[in-house]
Amino acid sequence: MKIKKAIVTGGTSGIGLAICEELLSRGTEVYSISRNPEKIKPRENFHLLKLDLSDLGAVSDFGSSFLKEYGTPDLLVNNAGYGAFYEWKEFPDDEIQRQINVLLSSPIILCKFFAPKMELQGKGTIVNISSLATLYPLPYMPLYNAGKSALSSFTQSMMLEHSGSLKWIDFRLGDIRTSFNESAPKQIEKSQSESMNRAWLQIEKQLNESPSAKFAARQIYQSIKKNKSGTIFGGGFFQAKLAPLFYRFLPFLGLIKVLKFRYR
Protein backbone atom coordinates (compact mmCIF):
# COMPACT_ATOMS: atom_id res chain seq x y z
CA MET A 1 0.00 0.00 0.00
CA LYS A 2 1.46 3.35 -1.06
CA ILE A 3 0.82 5.95 1.64
CA LYS A 4 0.69 9.40 0.08
CA LYS A 5 -0.73 11.43 2.97
CA ALA A 6 -0.72 10.64 6.70
CA ILE A 7 -1.84 12.23 9.96
CA VAL A 8 0.07 11.32 13.12
CA THR A 9 -1.04 12.64 16.51
CA GLY A 10 1.65 13.31 19.09
CA GLY A 11 4.15 13.60 16.27
CA THR A 12 6.76 15.91 17.79
CA SER A 13 8.47 13.47 20.15
CA GLY A 14 8.90 9.83 21.09
CA ILE A 15 7.03 7.18 19.16
CA GLY A 16 4.97 9.72 17.22
CA LEU A 17 8.04 11.50 15.85
CA ALA A 18 9.65 8.15 15.02
CA ILE A 19 6.52 7.16 13.06
CA CYS A 20 6.67 10.46 11.18
CA GLU A 21 10.35 9.88 10.33
CA GLU A 22 9.61 6.34 9.14
CA LEU A 23 6.84 7.58 6.85
CA LEU A 24 8.87 10.54 5.56
CA SER A 25 11.72 8.20 4.62
CA ARG A 26 9.27 6.36 2.37
CA GLY A 27 8.01 9.45 0.56
CA THR A 28 4.80 10.08 2.53
CA GLU A 29 3.51 13.60 3.11
CA VAL A 30 3.10 13.74 6.89
CA TYR A 31 0.94 16.01 9.05
CA SER A 32 2.13 15.94 12.66
CA ILE A 33 -0.50 16.98 15.22
CA SER A 34 0.55 18.20 18.66
CA ARG A 35 0.07 20.86 21.33
CA ASN A 36 3.58 22.20 20.84
CA PRO A 37 4.56 21.92 17.16
CA GLU A 38 7.29 24.53 17.65
CA LYS A 39 9.39 21.86 19.42
CA ILE A 40 10.69 20.72 16.04
CA LYS A 41 11.26 22.30 12.63
CA PRO A 42 9.08 21.63 9.59
CA ARG A 43 10.70 20.48 6.38
CA GLU A 44 9.70 19.22 2.97
CA ASN A 45 6.58 17.03 3.21
CA PHE A 46 6.53 17.44 7.01
CA HIS A 47 3.76 19.73 8.23
CA LEU A 48 3.38 20.69 11.89
CA LEU A 49 -0.16 21.50 13.03
CA LYS A 50 -1.19 22.70 16.47
CA LEU A 51 -4.04 20.97 18.31
CA ASP A 52 -4.86 20.32 21.96
CA LEU A 53 -6.48 16.89 22.05
CA SER A 54 -8.00 17.57 25.46
CA ASP A 55 -10.24 20.21 23.81
CA LEU A 56 -12.92 18.17 22.04
CA GLY A 57 -14.45 21.20 20.33
CA ALA A 58 -11.07 22.05 18.83
CA VAL A 59 -10.66 18.44 17.68
CA SER A 60 -13.97 18.58 15.80
CA ASP A 61 -13.00 21.91 14.22
CA PHE A 62 -9.67 20.41 13.19
CA GLY A 63 -11.34 17.45 11.48
CA SER A 64 -13.55 19.72 9.38
CA SER A 65 -10.81 22.20 8.49
CA PHE A 66 -8.26 19.51 7.60
CA LEU A 67 -10.61 17.86 5.13
CA LYS A 68 -11.39 21.19 3.49
CA GLU A 69 -7.78 22.35 3.29
CA TYR A 70 -5.79 19.16 2.73
CA GLY A 71 -8.29 16.50 1.68
CA THR A 72 -8.60 12.90 2.83
CA PRO A 73 -5.52 11.17 4.27
CA ASP A 74 -4.56 7.59 3.41
CA LEU A 75 -3.43 6.95 6.97
CA LEU A 76 -4.45 8.14 10.43
CA VAL A 77 -2.26 7.15 13.39
CA ASN A 78 -3.82 7.97 16.75
CA ASN A 79 -0.64 7.85 18.79
CA ALA A 80 -0.84 10.75 21.26
CA GLY A 81 -1.27 9.82 24.89
CA TYR A 82 0.14 10.06 28.37
CA GLY A 83 -0.16 8.44 31.78
CA ALA A 84 -0.92 10.09 35.12
CA PHE A 85 0.48 8.43 38.25
CA TYR A 86 -1.71 8.87 41.35
CA GLU A 87 -3.37 6.89 44.09
CA TRP A 88 -7.04 6.79 43.18
CA LYS A 89 -8.11 8.79 46.24
CA GLU A 90 -5.70 11.55 45.14
CA PHE A 91 -6.48 11.49 41.42
CA PRO A 92 -7.38 15.07 40.31
CA ASP A 93 -10.88 15.42 38.85
CA ASP A 94 -9.69 17.55 35.93
CA GLU A 95 -7.00 14.98 35.14
CA ILE A 96 -9.65 12.26 34.89
CA GLN A 97 -11.51 14.15 32.18
CA ARG A 98 -8.35 15.23 30.40
CA GLN A 99 -7.05 11.68 30.15
CA ILE A 100 -10.36 10.40 28.81
CA ASN A 101 -10.37 13.18 26.20
CA VAL A 102 -6.80 12.63 25.04
CA LEU A 103 -6.69 8.83 25.18
CA LEU A 104 -10.19 8.00 23.98
CA SER A 105 -12.61 10.75 22.96
CA SER A 106 -10.29 12.63 20.60
CA PRO A 107 -9.12 9.52 18.69
CA ILE A 108 -12.76 8.48 18.30
CA ILE A 109 -13.74 11.92 16.99
CA LEU A 110 -10.88 11.88 14.48
CA CYS A 111 -11.97 8.41 13.32
CA LYS A 112 -15.52 9.75 12.90
CA PHE A 113 -14.26 12.47 10.55
CA PHE A 114 -11.76 10.52 8.49
CA ALA A 115 -13.04 6.92 8.29
CA PRO A 116 -16.10 7.70 6.09
CA LYS A 117 -13.95 9.78 3.72
CA MET A 118 -11.39 7.00 3.46
CA GLU A 119 -14.14 4.55 2.57
CA LEU A 120 -15.42 6.88 -0.12
CA GLN A 121 -11.97 7.17 -1.70
CA GLY A 122 -11.66 3.38 -1.64
CA LYS A 123 -8.58 3.11 0.56
CA GLY A 124 -7.32 3.99 4.00
CA THR A 125 -5.81 2.69 7.22
CA ILE A 126 -6.46 3.79 10.79
CA VAL A 127 -3.96 2.73 13.44
CA ASN A 128 -5.04 3.25 17.02
CA ILE A 129 -2.08 2.83 19.36
CA SER A 130 -3.42 1.13 22.47
CA SER A 131 -1.21 -0.70 24.95
CA LEU A 132 -0.23 -3.98 26.50
CA ALA A 133 -1.85 -2.39 29.57
CA THR A 134 -5.15 -3.59 28.10
CA LEU A 135 -4.06 -7.02 29.38
CA TYR A 136 -1.54 -6.12 32.08
CA PRO A 137 -2.66 -2.90 33.80
CA LEU A 138 -0.10 -0.57 35.33
CA PRO A 139 -0.48 0.28 39.03
CA TYR A 140 -1.56 3.82 39.92
CA MET A 141 -2.37 4.60 36.27
CA PRO A 142 -6.07 3.63 36.19
CA LEU A 143 -7.17 6.18 33.60
CA TYR A 144 -4.34 5.24 31.25
CA ASN A 145 -5.29 1.56 31.54
CA ALA A 146 -8.98 2.32 31.07
CA GLY A 147 -8.50 4.73 28.17
CA LYS A 148 -6.23 2.41 26.23
CA SER A 149 -8.50 -0.58 26.87
CA ALA A 150 -11.53 1.35 25.65
CA LEU A 151 -9.66 2.52 22.54
CA SER A 152 -8.70 -1.09 21.82
CA SER A 153 -12.32 -2.20 22.16
CA PHE A 154 -13.49 0.66 19.93
CA THR A 155 -11.02 -0.35 17.22
CA GLN A 156 -12.18 -3.96 17.32
CA SER A 157 -15.79 -2.75 17.06
CA MET A 158 -14.87 -0.82 13.91
CA MET A 159 -13.38 -3.99 12.43
CA LEU A 160 -16.83 -5.57 12.75
CA GLU A 161 -18.47 -2.69 10.89
CA HIS A 162 -15.95 -2.21 8.10
CA SER A 163 -14.41 -4.54 5.59
CA GLY A 164 -12.60 -4.27 2.31
CA SER A 165 -10.89 -0.97 1.56
CA LEU A 166 -10.75 0.52 5.08
CA LYS A 167 -8.27 -1.17 7.43
CA TRP A 168 -8.30 -0.86 11.22
CA ILE A 169 -5.29 -1.78 13.36
CA ASP A 170 -5.41 -2.09 17.14
CA PHE A 171 -1.69 -1.83 17.91
CA ARG A 172 -1.08 -2.89 21.51
CA LEU A 173 2.34 -1.54 22.29
CA GLY A 174 4.46 -2.66 25.22
CA ASP A 175 7.12 -0.59 26.99
CA ILE A 176 9.17 1.64 24.70
CA ARG A 177 12.13 3.77 25.73
CA THR A 178 10.81 7.34 25.50
CA SER A 179 10.24 10.34 27.79
CA PHE A 180 6.80 8.93 28.71
CA ASN A 181 7.58 8.84 32.44
CA GLU A 182 9.28 12.24 32.48
CA SER A 183 6.15 13.96 31.16
CA ALA A 184 3.66 12.04 33.33
CA PRO A 185 1.70 14.10 35.89
CA LYS A 186 2.48 12.58 39.30
CA GLN A 187 1.32 12.72 42.86
CA ILE A 188 3.86 14.76 44.83
CA GLU A 189 6.58 12.45 46.11
CA LYS A 190 6.29 13.33 49.79
CA SER A 191 2.68 12.09 49.79
CA GLN A 192 3.46 8.84 47.95
CA SER A 193 3.27 5.58 49.84
CA GLU A 194 6.17 3.15 49.87
CA SER A 195 4.25 0.85 47.52
CA MET A 196 3.83 3.73 45.06
CA ASN A 197 7.56 4.45 45.13
CA ARG A 198 8.41 0.80 44.48
CA ALA A 199 5.88 0.59 41.64
CA TRP A 200 7.31 3.70 40.00
CA LEU A 201 10.86 2.35 40.22
CA GLN A 202 9.75 -0.87 38.50
CA ILE A 203 7.93 1.08 35.77
CA GLU A 204 11.09 3.17 35.24
CA LYS A 205 13.23 0.02 35.07
CA GLN A 206 10.95 -1.55 32.46
CA LEU A 207 11.03 1.61 30.35
CA ASN A 208 14.81 1.94 30.47
CA GLU A 209 15.28 -1.68 29.39
CA SER A 210 12.84 -1.40 26.48
CA PRO A 211 13.35 -1.06 22.71
CA SER A 212 13.70 2.37 21.10
CA ALA A 213 10.94 4.49 19.57
CA LYS A 214 12.50 3.86 16.16
CA PHE A 215 12.13 0.11 16.70
CA ALA A 216 8.44 0.56 17.56
CA ALA A 217 7.87 2.81 14.53
CA ARG A 218 9.23 0.13 12.21
CA GLN A 219 6.92 -2.46 13.78
CA ILE A 220 3.95 -0.13 13.28
CA TYR A 221 4.91 0.55 9.67
CA GLN A 222 5.24 -3.17 8.95
CA SER A 223 1.73 -3.73 10.32
CA ILE A 224 0.40 -1.02 7.99
CA LYS A 225 2.30 -2.49 5.04
CA LYS A 226 0.44 -5.80 5.41
CA ASN A 227 -2.76 -3.94 4.46
CA LYS A 228 -4.89 -5.98 6.86
CA SER A 229 -7.12 -5.19 9.80
CA GLY A 230 -6.27 -6.79 13.13
CA THR A 231 -4.91 -6.62 16.65
CA ILE A 232 -1.12 -6.56 16.78
CA PHE A 233 1.21 -6.63 19.77
CA GLY A 234 4.41 -4.59 19.59
CA GLY A 235 7.53 -3.93 21.61
CA GLY A 236 10.27 -6.28 22.75
CA PHE A 237 10.09 -10.04 22.20
CA PHE A 238 8.69 -10.91 25.62
CA GLN A 239 5.95 -8.26 25.60
CA ALA A 240 5.05 -8.64 21.92
CA LYS A 241 5.14 -12.45 21.72
CA LEU A 242 5.19 -14.19 25.09
CA ALA A 243 3.08 -11.90 27.29
CA PRO A 244 -0.10 -12.20 25.13
CA LEU A 245 0.31 -15.99 25.09
CA PHE A 246 0.91 -16.12 28.84
CA TYR A 247 -2.24 -14.06 29.42
CA ARG A 248 -4.42 -16.66 27.67
CA PHE A 249 -3.59 -19.29 30.27
CA LEU A 250 -3.59 -17.12 33.39
CA PRO A 251 -6.78 -16.85 35.51
CA PHE A 252 -7.74 -13.30 36.46
CA LEU A 253 -6.90 -13.69 40.14
CA GLY A 254 -3.59 -15.21 39.15
CA LEU A 255 -2.89 -12.21 36.94
CA ILE A 256 -3.56 -9.79 39.80
CA LYS A 257 -1.21 -11.75 42.06
CA VAL A 258 1.53 -11.72 39.42
CA LEU A 259 1.19 -7.97 38.87
CA LYS A 260 1.14 -7.19 42.59
CA PHE A 261 4.29 -9.25 43.04
CA ARG A 262 6.02 -7.52 40.12
CA TYR A 263 5.26 -3.99 41.28
CA ARG A 264 5.45 -4.53 45.06
Task: Give a label for each model feature.
Residues 12-13:
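Conserved glycine-rich cofactor-binding loop
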Residues 44-57:
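Rossmann-fold cofactor-recognition segment
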Residues 79-84:
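Conserved NAD(P)H cofactor-binding loop of Rossmann-fold oxidoreductase domains
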Residues 87-88, 95-100:
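Substrate-binding pocket helix/loop in short-chain dehydrogenase/reductase
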Residues 131:
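Residue(s) in the substrate-gating loop at a strand-loop-helix junction
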Residues 160-231:
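SDR active-site lid
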